[in-house]
Amino acid sequence: MFCMDLYKLFLEKKALLEGHFKLSSGLHSNKYFQCALLTAEPEIAEMLCETLAQKLRADKIEANLVIGPAIGGIILAYEMARALKVKAFFAEREEGQMRLRRGFTVKPDDKVIVVEDVVTTGGSTREVMDLVQSMGGEVVAVASLVDRSGGKVDFGVPFYPLLKVNVETYLPENCPLCAEGVPVVKPGSRK
């Protein structure tokens, strides 16, 4: 799938929202990619993750585990793992930190792909990477549906976004939408 096709899909599914949003990173933006509206349709989730898996296979990225941060990375981790025929875990926030729960554990010889729905600053992805490394695993790649940083994020491992866009973000104190008094909406999962 090409970038423009995915962008069109966001538009067709009304999954590219416009307004005033507070992102999981704490930054504000006038656009929000609601990936849940895409992954709610199993055939779309499967197709997107198979496309990501093809990119990883083409570059000979080998892993035995895919981990996604909750909530946006859960379905993606499962579908990526299914496409790659490996296990899928998800990390969830507990007391402000990403943790593996539910009996999930990373072993020292695990090679892990971290998958996320949208990357803005890469904060949640880095938290999962740190978690994997703290348990002795090796992160071999990062994948996402959307890189909205304009290519500015560097994870130190190969990064595979399906869609790269440069969408304006603002610190809350410099946000023109706040200055105009436009109410802010927080559609993401981080509190």
Swiss-Prot record:
Has UniProt tagged this entry with the keyword Magnesium? yes
Task: Name the keywords, alphabetized.
Answer: Glycosyltransferase, Magnesium, Pyrimidine biosynthesis, Transferase
> Its domain of life?
Bacteria
Assembly mode: Homodimer.
Describe the function of this protein: Catalyzes the transfer of a ribosyl phosphate group from 5-phosphoribose 1-diphosphate to orotate, leading to the formation of orotidine monophosphate (OMP).
Q: Which InterPro entries match?
A: OPRT, Orotate_PRibTrfase_bac, PRibTrfase_dom, PRTase-like
> Which residues are involved in binding orotate?
120, 148
Q: Which residues are noted in the entry as 5-phospho-alpha-D-ribose 1-diphosphate-binding?
A: 116-124
Q: HAMAP family, from UniProt?
A: PyrE
Q: Which reaction does it catalyse?
A: orotidine 5'-phosphate + diphosphate = orotate + 5-phospho-alpha-D-ribose 1-diphosphate
UniProt pathway: Pyrimidine metabolism; UMP biosynthesis via de novo pathway; UMP from orotate: step 1/2
Species in which this protein is naturally found: Carboxydothermus hydrogenoformans (strain ATCC BAA-161 / DSM 6008 / Z-2901)
* Coiled-coil ranges (or none): none
Q: What is its EC number?
A: 2.4.2.10
Please report which protein family the annotation says this sequence is part of.
Answer: Belongs to the purine/pyrimidine phosphoribosyltransferase family. PyrE subfamily.
Q: Which cofactor does it need?
A: Mg(2+)
Q: Which GO terms describe its molecular function?
A: magnesium ion binding; orotate phosphoribosyltransferase activity
Catalytic class of the enzyme: transferase
Q: Which SUPFAM superfamilies match?
A: PRTase-like (SSF53271)
Tell me one GO biological process term.
'de novo' UMP biosynthetic process
Its protein name is: Orotate phosphoribosyltransferase
